[in-house]
Amino acid sequence: MRAPGSGRLALPLLLLAVVALAEGDAKGLKEGETPGNFMEDEQWLSSISQYSGKIKHWNRFRDEVEDDYIKSWEDNQQGDEALDTTKDPCQKVKCSRHKVCVAQGYQRAMCISRKKLEHRIKQPSLKLHGGKDSVCKPCHMAQLASVCGSDGHTYSSVCKLEQQACLSSKQLAVRCEGPCPCPTEQSTASTTDSKSETCTGQDLADLGDRLRDWFQLLRENSKQNGSANSATNPAGLDKSLGASCKDSIGWMFSKLDTSGDLFLDQTELAAINLDKYEVCIRPFFNSCDTYKDGRVSTAEWCFCFWREKPPCLAELERTQIQEAAKKKPGVFIPSCDEDGYYRKMQCDQSRGDCWCVDQLGLELTGTRMHGTPDCDDIVGFSGDFGSGVGWEDEEEKETEEAGEEAEEEEGEAGEADDGGYIW
């Protein structure tokens, strides 16, 4: 027999079951795949949603490596939760239609294309799951330092670059530290462009005149602005500068010589920033450095702009211009002193010959030899610019010696008379 009132209880229970079933379907619809356009899936939404959880916009070109970095970052933020090694990390990961979820360790999961997966399965040495033998090693937050890869892309760390190389089966290397493009690429391109420009002999000859006119213009502008007398020249500058160098050329030297040592080094010469307009500016100043010591003295600076240069410096400039124009190796290069005149000894490095000259460069007969002649004994300098061999006249020498002997005899006779002999 049926208990009384059982039919009344069955109807409410049936209704409750129907309502629960409907709620379960609705919940399953929310948690499962969204019906309709598959592009509305969470996996295609931009990674901005992974930071805020609210802002979401369409972005089908997501970086797999960067997504992996974000997931690892979220996993690290959940450090309070105990690590559950029984759960598969791919349970909550949804991949696109042509990709498969692959677990790496207990907390990491990545979406890899089916073709790459099949390619890795064919290679027995590779393992898909994390471990000591895993090729695609995990990356940690402590290793973040952006680098530029050989493929032209910027990676958040070297580990990310190696991981991308592992995933894409490509050979990638670090081109430089920091984001792309590398600074060396830009500097190399500019250096190549500057080296492509060649300076002819006429260019070097005309550049000195243009610089002199430019210095004169700068000095006139400085006078008008009242700053010409603000910077006084060093005490030794006026003494070291020649008479023809105390105009705009000497004024420019005092402006450039910030150290006050009466020399212009490469840093001080770099203040004349005309490389963009004068491609021969550096070769010109290199030709001024006759000593090749990396700096330009006051004399070298003045001689660079002299219309009439001393003989040795003039020949040196002609030789350098010929080398720049024709590029002839083995050309004799004269050795000049600080005043622009020839040194006593000149040597041809290509032949190994050395000889003695005067200050005007005239070779003294019989002094050329293999080795180093003693030009100090051969050449006698008199005055500032005169030179010549110390020839002696034997007849005059004998006459002078005879006169000296007669004077000595007379002196001895006088001393004898003082003795007081009585005849």
UniProtKB/Swiss-Prot annotation:
Residues 391-423 have a biased composition (Acidic residues). The modification Phosphoserine is found at S72. The gene is Spock2. Residues 1-22 form the signal peptide. May participate in diverse steps of neurogenesis. Binds calcium. It comes from the Eukaryota. InterPro entries: EF-hand-dom_pair, Kazal_dom, Kazal_dom_sf, SPARC/Testican_Ca-bd-dom, Thyroglobulin_1, Thyroglobulin_1_sf. GO terms for biological process: cellular response to leukemia inhibitory factor; extracellular matrix organization; positive regulation of cell-substrate adhesion. Residues 130-182 form the Kazal-like domain. Brain specific. It is found in: Secreted, Extracellular space, Extracellular matrix. Residues 387-423 are annotated as: Disordered. Residues 309-375 form the Thyroglobulin type-1 domain. O-glycosylated; contains chondroitin sulfate and heparan sulfate. Glycans are attached at N225, S382, S387. This is Testican-2. PROSITE patterns: KAZAL_2, THYROGLOBULIN_1_1, THYROGLOBULIN_1_2. GO terms for cellular component: collagen-containing extracellular matrix; extracellular region. SMART domains: KAZAL, TY. CDD domains: KAZAL_FS (cd00104), TY (cd00191).
